């Protein structure tokens, strides 16, 4: 239980920050799912277009340190590889 004024304020801030970070993580997962769905659709050009938008979202969230930069890089790498495999 937060006893000091500072601790109470930090507890309030933590609730707000948690909600904001959760929303950003959700946006990241949604972007990855959108690319996966486009890949499953079979249209390489459409998948590449969706991937380009997802890349921006992934990088932005990694820059804010919501997810680790290596996790973001891994996600982009796997999606890119999946798109490249479509042509083969």
Swiss-Prot record:
GO terms for molecular function: small ribosomal subunit rRNA binding; structural constituent of ribosome. GO terms for cellular component: cytosol; small ribosomal subunit. GO terms for biological process: translation. The keyword Ion transport does not apply. Transmembrane segments: none annotated. Keywords: Ribonucleoprotein, Ribosomal protein, RNA-binding, rRNA-binding. Residues 1-20 are annotated as: Disordered. PANTHER family: 30S RIBOSOMAL PROTEIN S20 (PTHR33398), SMALL RIBOSOMAL SUBUNIT PROTEIN BS20C (PTHR33398:SF1). This is Small ribosomal subunit protein bS20. It comes from Ralstonia nicotianae (strain ATCC BAA-1114 / GMI1000). The gene is rpsT.
